Structures are given as C-alpha cells and as structure tokens.
C-alpha cells in the first residue's frame, strides 16, 4: 500500500459542479459554529435548546458480540444446522451494554448534550474518526487528500449528489439494468439516463467506450454525459461483481472523457463468490486475518482513483440496520464541501440518536470486532444464497451452459424447465412447455438478489400478447398465490413500453425469508408456472 506522502492530491474538478452546486453558500447560522469551541465563549447567537431540558438522562443498549455468528458452517451433512438455529432462537445471545450519559465524563466522550443538539452537517467527531480509519484501511484511496462526510443513507446521499453535480437536460451514464430508485430520484431534476451494455461483471467497458466515442450531440439532443452512476458490487438487480481490472478499464475511460464516477456500494461486504451446487459443495469457512479478508474483496473504485473523480456512497444499512439512515461519502475535499453545504439547509446532520448508537457500537467492537462481524455476515448471506438456489435445483430441471452474449456474457447460465407433475396436466414426450427452458439466471456473486430472465415463447398466447403482457400476467398470478417478486421492467434504465422488445424478468430476493419460506416460495413459483404455461389467455 502506497503511503499518503507518495500519493498526489486530487485534481481540480470544480467544473463538474452543477449551477445549484456552485451557487450554494454556507448557511449563515452554521457559519457561527467555528467560534463555538473557543474557551470561555458565551454564546447568545443560536437558538439552541437548553440541554438540561432534554428528557433523556442517558441512552443505553445491548450489543451483540462481534463473533455472534460463526466463520464456518460445519460439516457437509450439517451445513444448515446453524441456519435453522438462526430462526429458532433457542440459544441465548451474547451481548454487552453501553450507556451514553447527558454530559461527558472526559473530553471527547460521546454525550447527549452535544449528540442531541443542533450541530454541523459533518456529524459527531468521534464517529468521523472511526469512519476515516475504516476507509483508509479497507478502501485505500489512491490520492492523499481524500475525505469523508456522513450522510443520512445512500438514497438521500445520491439525491444530494445529483443536485450538486448534474444540471437539467444532462445525461447520466448507467447500466442498462439499474436501481430504479436512483433513476426516480434523478428524473425530477431533468437528468436523462444513458444506458450502457452489460456482461457478467456489470457495466461493459467496451460498450462504454463505444458509446462515448460515437456520441453525436446533434442526434442525441444533449451533450456527452460527464457523470456515471454505478452499483459495482451486488449490481442491482443482476447480482454481479465487478473486479479490479474492469474498474481500471472504466476508470481510464472516465479519465479520457472527464467523467465523474458515483459509486453506490451498499452490498460491498456481501460478496459471496461463485455458487457451487449442493452436490459439489464443501464446508464453507471465512477464516483468515483481517488483511486476508480485505484482500479477498473486489476493491472499490477508490483503489484506482488517483484524481479524486470518484464519489463513493457507503451505508450502514446492510451491515448494521437500514433504519439507522446513516452512511458516508468518500470523495475529494471540493465535492465534500459542496455536499456539506447541501446538507446544511436540508437534512442537516444525521439523527443524533443514530450517530450515538452506531458510534457506541463501533467503539465497543473496535476495528477488529467490526471486521469480524463483516466476515461472518458475508458467510450468512452466502449460505442464504446457496440455500435459495438449491431450492431452484430441487423444484426445476436445471441445465448449465456458458453464456457469450448480453448481460450474462462470461458466466454460466442456469436454464430451468419444469419437472413434470402429472397431478396438474397430462404430459406427452413432445410437450414443449415442459421440455424447453421457461426461465434462466446466473447465480449472483454478491448482494441479495437473483435476476430471472423469462422464456415464455412456448406459452399458447405468446403470439397475441408478447413478452410484457405475459410477464405481468405471470407476476400477478404468482402474487395472488402468495409470493411477491419484483417485476423486471422497473429496473430497465429507460421506460419500458408495451412494444419494447426482449424477454421479461423478475428480481427475487433471498435476504429476509426463513428457509421454510424460501422453499415454499420456489415451490409456489413452480406450481403457478405449470398451470400458467398451459392456460390460454
């Protein structure tokens, strides 16, 4: 790892600020905070409620031990025993307690007097120290003057970023399949999505280069885009993982065309690796020291960002809890200062309670404890993914084939056809509705989702209805049977019209259901498919 002394500073990228981003000024009242720490100061300037009237004398909580979840799953025969224990809650949880008092016992202690008071958008100093240490050790930015800034979760962080660096009528580079809430957030600001082709690592550097090199403003109607939005790990919805070589390729293209990369990475620590079918699986283990664990993760764009053109969005939503609404930016100081100005007159600092609770958790665990938690968390979600995909293998007949085209190129595809159940319909050897694949997927390598591509060409009403109508009809019947999938059309970067060509898709989550529910959901899906494929609409 190169020392900061040998690394250059971020280049001047202020020309990427939007008109709104340029116009923001320091909140007049917030500008007074620079005097607040002066010894002996009597402040009569701000409308700060008296901390003596806060109705909380202290706050406290119980924290799970960082090693509450195992780093290995045991023998092959009992590989799910820990999984069932997770839902039975038969074993007493090991916890420790923390308490935050109203006033600090020692200088720098967490306390309610300052933690629950109005403050700067930069948040609690102690939490900032923890975050900065974590980023330096884990993400290792490639320039010296990087900084961090807390925010209220990646959704709001992205909204602030859009306002800060994008103007109405400008383009935004995105993957052809992308996170719909990010697009919904940008759309009211008049931002135009520019879809880029994908393969099994996510955004294709070849497609990106081609799109930018061939850009014709007179045809497109707006200038070549200068901002990219990407979810490189656990790509939402496809579940792919982008490696360091692809990131270097894309980063170099962004340097060539002067593009800012917004790296939205909530699933970073849920990198599960390749799926191994149940019959071939051996004991899972996450042993190894902290550096081995960190080295096993696909690096962030920060690792190759020597110019400060990456704005990274991190969140505690997937590693602690989503209700915390807490995360942080990592970016160059110029962007951080502009984002701070945006927060001053909107969300301000994240919730004081949230900051105190999360800071207390991380102080209790320390860096080593948090890394231990993350190691086990990755294994937990890996086992969930494996079990869910195993259920597909039990319910459907699967054929594995290497894909060379489209967003699955470079990965093995699983083609699923129905296993006949004579209790539903008569079956002949030539029944194509059973013998041909009805959907396919690549096993996700990160995140929480499986992305199913539907193959409904053998449906008796396909010629008259087409892909989209059949997709939504099938989705409705699955929902009415008690299982809810996310319709694929909402994840397309641009609006899907009735005549948009191409197969339908479903995004299916394995993150929050019990093993029994997962198995039932896949079985229900199979039952609905059997009936659906033999029903003319």
Predicted regions and their residues:
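Short beta-strand segments
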Residues: 43-46, 195, 229-232, 262-265, ...
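Conserved core of the PLP fold type I
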Residues: 68-258, 262, 268-304, 381, ...
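Short, solvent-exposed loop/turn segments at secondary-structure junctions
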Residues: 47-51, 155-156, 178-180, 201, ...
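PLP-dependent enzyme catalytic core of the Aspartate aminotransferase-like
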Residues: 480-537
């Amino acid at each position: 790892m190169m020392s900061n002394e040998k690394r250059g500073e971020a280049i001047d990228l202020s020309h990427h600020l939007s008109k709104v981003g340029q116009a923001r000024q320091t909140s007049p009242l917030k500008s007074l905070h620079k005097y607040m720490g002066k010894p002996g100061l009597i402040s009569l300037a701000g409308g700060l409620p008296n901390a003596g009237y806060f109705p909380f004398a202290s706050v406290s909580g119980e924290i799970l031990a960082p090693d509450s979840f195992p780093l290995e799953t045991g023998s092959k025969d009992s590989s799910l025993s820990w999984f069932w224990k997770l839902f039975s809650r038969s074993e007493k949880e090991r916890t420790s307690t923390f308490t935050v008092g109203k006033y600090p016992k020692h200088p720098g202690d967490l306390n309610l007097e300052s933690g629950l008071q109005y403050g700067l958008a930069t948040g609690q100093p102690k939490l900032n120290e923890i975050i900065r240490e974590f980023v330096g050790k884990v993400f290792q930015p490639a320039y010296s003057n990087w900084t961090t800034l807390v925010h209220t979760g990646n959704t709001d962080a992205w909204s602030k970023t859009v306002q800060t660096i994008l103007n109405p009528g400008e383009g935004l580079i995105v993957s052809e399949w992308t996170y719909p809430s990010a697009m919904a957030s940008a759309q009211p600001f008049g931002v135009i999505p520019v879809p880029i082709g994908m393969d099994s690592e996510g955004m294709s550097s070849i497609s990106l280069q081609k799109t930018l090199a061939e850009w014709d403003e007179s045809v497109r109607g707006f200038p070549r885009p200068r901002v990219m939005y990407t979810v490189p790990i656990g790509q939402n919805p496809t579940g792919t993982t982008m490696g360091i070589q692809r990131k270097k390729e894309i980063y170099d293209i962004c340097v060539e065309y002067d593009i800012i990369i917004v790296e939205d990475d909530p699933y970073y620590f849920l990198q599960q690796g390749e799926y191994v079918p149940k019959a071939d699986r051996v004991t899972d283990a996450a042993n190894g020291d902290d550096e081995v664990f960190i080295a096993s993760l696909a690096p962030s764009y920060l690792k190759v960002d020597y110019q400060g053109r990456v704005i990274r969005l991190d969140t505690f939503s997937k590693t602690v809890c989503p209700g915390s609404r807490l995360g942080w930016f990592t970016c160059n100081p110029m962007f951080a200062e502009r984002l701070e100005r945006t927060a001053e007159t909107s969300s301000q600092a994240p919730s004081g309670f949230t900051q105190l609770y999360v800071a207390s958790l991380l102080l209790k665990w320390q860096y080593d404890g948090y890394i231990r938690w993350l190691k086990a968390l990755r294994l937990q979600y890996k086992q969930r993914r494996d079990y869910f995909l195993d259920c597909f293998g039990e319910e459907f007949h699967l054929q594995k084939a290497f894909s060379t085209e489209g967003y699955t190129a470079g990965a093995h595809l699983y083609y699923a056809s129905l296993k006949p159940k004579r209790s539903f319909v008569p079956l002949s050897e030539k029944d194509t509705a059973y013998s041909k694949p009805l959907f396919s997927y690549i096993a996700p390598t990160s995140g929480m989702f499986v992305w199913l591509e539907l193959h409904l060409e053998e449906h008796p009403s396909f010629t008259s209805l087409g892909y989209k109508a059949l997709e939504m009809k099938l989705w409705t019947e699955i929902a009415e049977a008690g299982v809810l999938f996310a319709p694929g059309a909402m994840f397309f970067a641009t609006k899907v019209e009735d005549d948009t060509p191409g197969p339908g898709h479903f995004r299916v989550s394995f993150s929050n259901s019990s093993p029994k529910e997962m198995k039932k959901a896949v079985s229900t899906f199979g039952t609905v498919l059997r009936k659906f494929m033999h029903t003319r609409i």
